[in-house]
């Protein structure tokens, strides 16, 4: 029989019940049940929508250190074949938030039993994948009352081996924006295309034109990505489609590039309206702020990891990944780092299986870091 640590077991429990943004009711209850099993003398627990705040009072606090873990899953049908695979059809923890939660609970458990001088604030945040839980959580009355002096978060990285962390000072993750474009023309019989305005053709033309933006409208020394991940159009093979919907994402390493990309998208869409005699509506959906690591705190963290732990530390490059933790970092000094979990499949893949050995390594590492930071003069 397989022997696993308590927090690996927790991860497997949570992996079975992935839930989408602001629908994490089972997840919230599971977390609350566990938190309520801990010594309560120094804990103050409050809920916010489907999220949770847990404050651990220090022995003689001079500051509050925040730690954020996201809790939502993705609308992906799992293909791992694991015995603890998702029990929710069409939903999966394909971005490692089950790992994030189990690590947070492990660290919380230690400090519930072994308080340090400073206060700790654990933030279990819903809806990271969308529509975005960090910004409204940051603006909540609870956060205003308990606002930490610094804040930390991690994200699993399938490409790095267990025992590795990766981060950098300054910009770590990109600015991101959702992109939805609806095209409305005139449907008709497939035999009479001259009497209709075909939105399949219009959509295909627009997708091709959008890909020219990065090549011809963004500074080559800057970076941008435009991806159309989904196109919906038509009802049957012999009817010309009256409507088409494009769904995608924009990612840039600067606000200026994001604004330039959006201006060009709007110009191209106007051109498609004229060329294909259709109506178009653009919706940018949710936009996530860049993740910008506080240079001083990040340098200090890297030096701690290199000199006080056995973790392998990599100073990585910035990534085009999007993370709404950026909103918290825009108001609170802190940083985010990658945690190696050594999986052949990447984030958002239906076969993602993080190496669970990373969980206890991360718990021990963060306990060491917070103990050091939380007792520092």
UniProtKB/Swiss-Prot annotation:
Catalytic activity: N-acetyl-(2S,6S)-2,6-diaminopimelate + H2O = (2S,6S)-2,6-diaminopimelate + acetate
EC number assigned by the record: 3.5.1.47
Keywords: Amino-acid biosynthesis, Diaminopimelate biosynthesis, Hydrolase, Lysine biosynthesis
Active site (catalytic residues): 70, 129
Biological-process GO terms, alphabetical: diaminopimelate biosynthetic process; lysine biosynthetic process via diaminopimelate
SUPFAM superfamilies in alphabetical order: Bacterial exopeptidase dimerisation domain, Zn-dependent exopeptidases
InterPro entries, alphabetized: AcetylDAP_deacetylase, Amidohydrolase, Bact_exopeptidase_dim_dom, Peptidase_M20, Peptidase_M20_dimer
Pfam families listed in its UniProt record: M20_dimer, Peptidase_M20
GO MF annotation, one: N-acetyldiaminopimelate deacetylase activity
NCBIfam families in the cross-refs: amidohydrolases
Stated family: Belongs to the peptidase M20A family. N-acetyldiaminopimelate deacetylase subfamily.
Protein name: N-acetyldiaminopimelate deacetylase
Native source species: Geobacillus thermodenitrificans (strain NG80-2)
């Amino acid at each position: 029989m397989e022997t696993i640590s308590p927090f690996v077991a927790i991860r497997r429990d949570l992996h079975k019940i992935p839930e989408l943004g602001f629908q994490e009711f089972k997840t919230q209850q599971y977390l609350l049940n566990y938190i309520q099993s801990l010594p309560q003398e120094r804990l103050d627990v409050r809920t916010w929508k489907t999220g949770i705040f847990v404050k651990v009072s220090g022995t003689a606090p001079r500051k509050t250190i925040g730690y954020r873990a996201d809790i939502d899953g993705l609308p992906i049908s799992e293909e791992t074949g694991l015995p603890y695979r998702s029990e929710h059809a069409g939903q999966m923890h394909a971005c490692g938030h089950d790992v994030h939660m189990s690590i947070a609970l492990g660290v919380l458990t230690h400090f519930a039993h072994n308080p340090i001088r400073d206060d700790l604030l654990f933030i279990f945040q819903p809806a990271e994948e969308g529509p975005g839980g960090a910004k409204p959580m940051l603006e909540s009355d609870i956060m205003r009352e308990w606002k930490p002096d610094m804040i930390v978060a991690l994200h699993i990285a399938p490409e790095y081996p267990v025992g590795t962390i990766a981060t950098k000072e300054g910009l770590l993750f990109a600015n991101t924006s959702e992109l939805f474009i609806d095209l409305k023309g005139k449907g008709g019989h497939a035999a009479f295309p001259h009497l209709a305005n075909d939105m399949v053709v219009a959509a295909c033309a627009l997708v091709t034109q959008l890909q020219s933006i990065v090549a011809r409208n963004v500074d080559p020394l800057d970076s941008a990505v435009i991806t159309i991940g989904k196109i919906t159009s038509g009802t049957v093979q012999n009817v010309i489609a009256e409507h088409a919907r494009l769904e995608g994402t924009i990612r840039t390493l600067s606000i200026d590039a994001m604004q330039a990309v959006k201006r060009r998208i709007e110009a191209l869409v106007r051109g498609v309206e004229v060329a294909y005699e259709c109506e178009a509506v653009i919706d940018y959906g949710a936009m996530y702020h860049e993740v910008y690591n506080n240079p001083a705190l990040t340098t200090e963290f890297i030096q701690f990891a290199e000199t006080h732990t056995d973790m392998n530390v990599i100073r990585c490059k910035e990534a085009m990944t999007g993370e709404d933790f950026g909103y918290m970092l825009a108001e609170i000094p802190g940083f985010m780092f990658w945690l190696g979990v050594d999986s052949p499949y990447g984030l958002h893949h239906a076969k993602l299986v993080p190496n669970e050995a990373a969980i206890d390594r991360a718990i021990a590492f963060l306990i060491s870091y917070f103990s050091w930071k939380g007792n520092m003069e």
